[in-house]
Curated annotation (Swiss-Prot):
Name of the protein in its database record: UPF0434 protein VC_1876
SUPFAM superfamilies: Trm112p-like
One term under GO cellular component: cytosol
Protein family: Belongs to the UPF0434 family.
Pfam family, one: Trm112p
PANTHER family: PROTEIN PREY, MITOCHONDRIAL (PTHR33505:SF4), ZGC:162634 (PTHR33505)
Origin organism lineage: Bacteria, Pseudomonadati, Pseudomonadota, Gammaproteobacteria, Vibrionales
């Protein structure tokens, strides 16, 4: 994941900052507790495609 891209992308729900989870290949919004998948190197920033994170994840 290009770190320059992380500087400009935002959560489509709250417009907050996203962090990159290399192991899961996801972009994480800690505010909304949503994880957006990265498929074939392309972030899929669609709310229906995001998975809800448990309360224990992302701590």
């Amino acid at each position: 994941m290009d770190h320059r891209l992380l500087e400009i992308v935002a959560c489509p729900v709250c417009k907050g900052k996203l962090t990159y989870d290399k192991d899961r290949q996801e972009l994480i919004c800690k505010l909304d507790r949503l994880a957006y998948p990265i498929k074939e190197g392309i972030p899929v920033l669609l709310e229906p495609e995001a998975r809800s994170m448990s309360m224990d994840e992302g701590r």
